């Protein structure tokens, strides 16, 4: 039974971020959402420039827009690759079985889509034992750590709700 869902998880993260940012900037939530939509539109234009995108990831609402527009499909791609590619799945298992954990470097890691995609893939496998992941995030935008931590908290909350308080009963 897979309980980790990309849109549900990111929806909780985005909703909490919008509430916090609106409070910090002293603006209504609705205004924050409008600004997110504006960032989505502007970011789409930037990505199509031949000179390379100039996206203001240092702005919190821009990062929320990225979470909304890009994180779900990216997390789905991560999960799909690990689910469909037996070679990478077997390699992942070999590393975990030999070392007791899998260390992953998220280079240009962004908002945490690797964490979300792998968590869903691992849970769906229903292996009967816990997989331990150790992430190293390398990104020129240090603020992405906030969304990584938020995604991790929502995943942990979901796992606790569905598997109980004993973390050794969790799949990840």
Positions of predicted regions on the chain:
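N-terminal auxiliary segments of SAM/dcSAM-dependent transferases
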Residues: 1-52
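Conserved class I S-adenosyl-L-methionine
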Residues: 99-110
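Conserved SAM-binding loop of SAM-dependent methyltransferases across substrates and taxa
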Residues: 111-128
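Phosphate/oxyanion-binding active-site loops and adjacent basic polyanion-contact surfaces
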Residues: 70-82, 110-115, 141-148
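Active-site catalytic pocket residues across diverse enzymes, especially alpha/beta-hydrolases
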Residues: 85, 89, 122-126, 152-155
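Class I SAM-dependent methyltransferase Rossmann-like catalytic core
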Residues: 51-96
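Conserved SAM-binding motif I beta-strand of class I
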Residues: 129, 134-139
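S-adenosyl-L-methionine
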Residues: 143-172
């Amino acid at each position: 039974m897979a309980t980790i869902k990309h849109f549900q998880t990111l929806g909780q993260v985005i909703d909490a971020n919008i509430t916090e940012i609106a409070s910090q900037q002293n603006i209504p939530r609705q205004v924050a959402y409008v600004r997110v939509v504006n960032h989505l539109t502007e970011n789409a234009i930037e990505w199509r420039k031949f000179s390379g995108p100039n996206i203001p990831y240092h702005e919190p609402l821009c990062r929320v827009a990225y979470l909304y527009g890009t994180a779900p499909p990216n997390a789905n791609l991560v999960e799909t690759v690990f689910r469909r590619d037996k070679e990478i799945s077997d390699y992942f298992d070999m590393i975990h079985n030999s070392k007791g954990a899998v260390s992953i470097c998220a280079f240009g890691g962004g908002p945490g889509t690797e964490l979300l995609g792998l968590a869903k893939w691992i849970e769906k496998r229903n292996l009967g034992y816990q997989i331990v992941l150790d992430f190293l995030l390398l990104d020129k935008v240090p603020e992405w750590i906030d969304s990584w931590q938020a995604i991790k908290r929502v995943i942990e909350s979901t796992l606790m709700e569905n598997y109980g308080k004993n973390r050794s009963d969790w799949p990840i």
